[in-house]
From Swiss-Prot:
It catalyses: 2 chloride(in) + H(+)(out) = 2 chloride(out) + H(+)(in). It comes from Pongo abelii. Coiled coil: none annotated. The record marks 281 as: Mediates proton transfer from the outer aqueous phase to the interior of the protein. The gene is CLCN5. Interacts with NEDD4 and NEDD4L. Pfam families: CBS (PF00571), Voltage_CLC (PF00654). ATP binds at residues 666, 687-689, 794-797. Chloride binds at residues 238, 525, 628. The chain crosses the membrane at residues 125-162, 208-231, 256-275, 281-300, 348-366, 389-414, 422-442, 498-518, 523-542, 605-622. The keyword Repeat applies. SUPFAM superfamilies: CBS-domain pair, Clc chloride channel. This is H(+)/Cl(-) exchange transporter 5. One of its GO terms (molecular function) is voltage-gated chloride channel activity.
Amino acid sequence: MAMWQGAMDNRGFQRGSFSSFQNSSSDEDLMDIPATAMDFSMRDDVPPLDREVGEDKSYNGGGIGSSNRIMDFLEEPIPGVGTYDDFNTIDWVREKSRDRDRHREITNKSKESTWALIHSVSDAFSGWLLMLLIGLLSGSLAGLIDISAHWMTDLKEGICTGGFWFNHEHCCWNSEHVTFEERDKCPEWNSWSQLIISTDEGAFAYIVNYFMYVLWALLFAFLAVSLVKVFAPYACGSGIPEIKTILSGFIIRGYLGKWTLVIKTITLVLAVSSGLSLGKEGPLVHVACCCGNILCHCFNKYRKNEAKRREVLSAAAAAGVSVAFGAPIGGVLFSLEEVSYYFPLKTLWRSFFAALVAAFTLRSINPFGNSRLVLFYVEFHTPWHLFELVPFILLGIFGGLWGALFIRTNIAWCRKRKTTQLGKYPVIEVLVVTAITAILAFPNEYTRMSTSELISELFNDCGLLDSSKLCDYENRFNTSKGGELPDRPAGVGVYSAMWQLALTLILKIVITIFTFGMKIPSGLFIPSMAVGAIAGRLLGVGMEQLAYYHQEWTVFNSWCSQGADCITPGLYAMVGAAACLGGVTRMTVSLVVIMFELTGGLEYIVPLMAAAMTSKWVADALGREGIYDAHIRLNGYPFLEAKEEFAHKTLAMDVMKPRRNDPLLTVLTQDSMTVEDVETIISETTYSGFPVVVSRESQRLVGFVLRRDLIISIENARKKQDGVVSTSIIYFTEHSPPLPPYTPPTLKLRNILDLSPFTVTDLTPMEIVVDIFRKLGLRQCLVTHNGRLLGIITKKDVLKHIAQMANQDPDSILFN
């Protein structure tokens, strides 16, 4: 089968000669039919087809008609036919069929010549080469983002006089005047007060540093939101809800384009550096998918087939998580569990390869200078005990409650943003939230530091030489066996840190609600993990002190002896981080694997599993949707969730259009309509496709034709053949209809007709129809009764019906 020109290259074909085509109709409005009264008492003995296809003829068409005046312009591919308009859903069945035909043709030709064999081998290898390129580009961009964000975050507090391109840590690495206890202080690093007023002491110096911190934060946020607004509006947010929708078959032109990639990369650095409560991990998935989409254009196999391209995007999403967390296996599982709609075994292998290459590339760049892929990598050595499952489950309950609370409040705020004047002033909103965040963050060292550094500090297992306030314990021992420190009483620094962390927790919980969803790149992974890590560290320190002061208690004396290292507060922080992230996203398997890859400890999988499952159960009890599904519904994307069961006893006839007493279904006949008739129907309707029937009287179904293919084919015929006029007959049969002499040439369009559209009877239960739409990725399904066409069910009709059954607003299923 000939392959059509790739969808991404055909913006020009949106400019048809018909106004309705210029308006770029959505196939989700496919048959908002001005519908018809249905006569369900129609006779069963419908007369046979007017013209049966000859037994010795090919049913798929493409043959030459008997009349020498027949114009069949589809012997050669017409650019644009078989492609899709913006905000349309792809036809998964047709795309997979076209790829099988292409593969069959290449395989057959490979037996004919050496050159064809080489072409066959290169075609098979192209997928792996594409994965290699995606991994290299994603890893390189992630390294660039990490290094730039680290430097710009430190720029808010000062600058390195030994080289302005060094961040604080790198600046002091080569200094000869730094001590181990104060390794973050060196003469080469100057705060803004030292540069401006030559001193770092006193109230005025504090005010200068405070002012510069807020000023830099506002500047970075202003640049980020301005670049997004002017150059790439699609670069805002995390991108994961939209990527889920795109992977389900929806087309959003430009969302994964070159400008989006460039602006998202730049503004992600600016947004993270501004100190807002957001992360770069979610947007890195969007960046990786942009890389995958752009590189697809180098390979015809993927450029010209939307279904194959979505397999590549699934692998790119895995590479994005791989570089975000340094977790290649977790990335593959994230793509499978959270974002992918269609995930065949071949995609699993290629996703693994892309994630591996991306992680290796980032490791080679070594952005943090510690040979790790993430800033908060940590290793624990103390085993956990069975009793600790109780506080771990408590952290899971907290994570579920936080997740449900966050989703409800964030969605309410985002809905307010969409429905009020607030949404018209994205720059002001970003600047106000940034100013509030910066003003409240600077006085507290735990909110002033970047969120990744905060998580690293909370995960840290205190050693004897740690200078952090969280490790300010009273050392009441002489020796330390095996390098492990026993549980110790908390010092002044620990109590001070607890109060500061409690305030940090409150700020993070509140400010993240208003930050996620603003018109800047904003991920949710890191803020959610920070909330959980703070709660976990607070609980961990509490358990540690309880075990130290009350070792005689029954729950402790069986396993925690005097002078032993019983409780690891950093482990509680890690479990809390997993619980809160699971509560917000509802991830389970991939979340546990990502956290396991972060810590490198197999023995902590059980605590992580207990917390992740508890948080999911608690959050699901309070609301079924994760944050990404909630944003998909808020934006009205046509996404059919595969995880939800449809348990209602409705039938196809209850959902199809037209309903009883509605106008008749708009159809085309197979051989009796003129070009003018078809153009009139196209100009007067906005449907994205039309059923083709034998005749209006019989309503016997022949096939289904897409609006876009009709328009392009008719326009192409008018340009290339002088004989085609408005009175030319259009026919979809194998042979030309008998015509009187001196009639204008006919136009054969059988090759754009889908001869095997999916059909169900009017009495088919809707649970089966919903299952068909989910598993086959259909755009529409025709409804028949005894072989006669009754109506049509589109994907949007299914979504509206599901919303109606769930007592939600069915009109919210629109692309907003």
